[in-house]
Structures are given as structure tokens and as C-alpha cells.
Regions:
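Substrate-binding groove of N-acetylhexosamine-processing glycoside hydrolases
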Residues: 1-177
Length: 177
């Protein structure tokens, strides 16, 4: 079911080549709408699916296939956070922003799992469960960095450990292709 987005994109491109990146993006958005809603209109669920899709692109692609970057909008924010963390700078603003982003991705995964097309969810629930666990891990790890700033060892270690447990859970799912 999830592959229908790519099939829709390819069919549209083959039938009438895109004239701009904006047109390609519009077609891609419409494909996500159709896969989730069975029609071409936006919905809360199709927007959630589209947002999750931006962060779940397969990076193990053969060399002859154009590489699609994963989490393009998020990567620079994570790099900036990491660099500030290494240099001991204040992370309050970046931490808050990342927590909001991760909370939204978690909410998107939960919404899609609860209200998405049943055939689609049956096939991708592993990715959705993985996403929820990964976002829980990231939330805990970000909270651990608060403990670093506060010089609160218990907060660091409790949240670091919680983050590792969530991460371990996230990699426990069997993905069937």
C-alpha cells in the first residue's frame, strides 16, 4: 500500500513530465492523500503520513538510483544541537524546538496508526511503532542533556537509560518486505 505513493508519482511523471519541483511536490502530496483517503483531498491523516514519509526514506539504495535525502529539514537542526552540546553551549532553545518536532512526529505516527487506511497500517505498523519508540528515546535523551546543564547526575543517567530502553525497543520489530 505505501508503495502506491511511488507508483502514483512514476505514473504521473511518465504520462506528463513534471515542469517544476513545485509541480512534482504537488503530485507527491496528492499521492499521499489518495493512498490514505482514497481521494485527492488533504486530511489530517494524509498530512501526518506525508510528514512521516519525509523522515523515512530508504538510504540503502543502489548506486544507479537518485539518492533521496532523509529528514532534510531536521538534519541541520540536529547537527547544530550536537555541535553546541560538544562545545558546552546553552541548548535550551534548540532542545525545546527538537522536543516539539519529535513530539509532532510521534503524534503523526499515532494518528496514522489509529485513523489510517487499515490495509496500509497492516503493512507499516512496524515503522509506526518504531517511530513512536524512537521519538520516546529522543525525548528522554534530550531531557538527559538538561541534566548535564543542571549538573544533575541522576537526571542524566535516568533519562539516558530510559532513552536506551526506548531505542532498544525500537529496533526489536521484525520488518517484512
Amino acid at each position: 500500500e505505501a508503495s502506491k505513493v511511488a507508483l502514483f508519482d512514476m505514473a504521473q511523471y511518465g504520462w506528463k513530465q513534471w515542469r517544476s519541483a513545485q509541480e512534482a511536490e504537488q503530485i507527491n502530496d496528492t499521492a499521499f492523500n489518495y493512498v490514505v483517503n482514497g481521494n485527492f483531498k488533504d486530511s489530517e491523516v494524509s498530512k501526518a503520513f506525508r510528514e512521516l514519509g519525509k523522515h523515512m526514506r530508504n538510504q540503502n539504495r543502489p548506486p544507479h538510483v537518485t539518492k533521496l535525502e532523509e529528514s532534510v529539514e531536521l538534519a541541520p537542526k540536529l547537527t547544530a544541537f550536537y555541535n553546541k552540546l560538544k562545545s558546552g553551549q546553552n541548548l535550551d532553545v534548540e532542545r525545546k524546538e527538537l522536543k516539539e518536532i519529535f513530539a509532532q512526529l510521534k503524534a503523526d505516527a499515532i494518528l496514522l496508526k489509529e485513523k489510517g487506511d487499515k490495509k496500509l497500517i497492516h503493512q507499516i505498523h512496524y515503522w509506526l511503532d518504531n517511530t513512536v519508540d524512537q521519538m520516546n528515546a529522543l525525548e528522554a535523551l534530550l531531557t538527559a542533556t538538561e541534566g548535564l546543564a543542571e549538573k544533575n547526575d541522576a537526571k542524566v543517567w535516568d533519562n539516558y537509560y530510559a532513552g536506551l530502553k526506548h531505542y532498544d525497543q525500537s529496533i526489536s520489530y521484525a520488518f517484512f518486505y
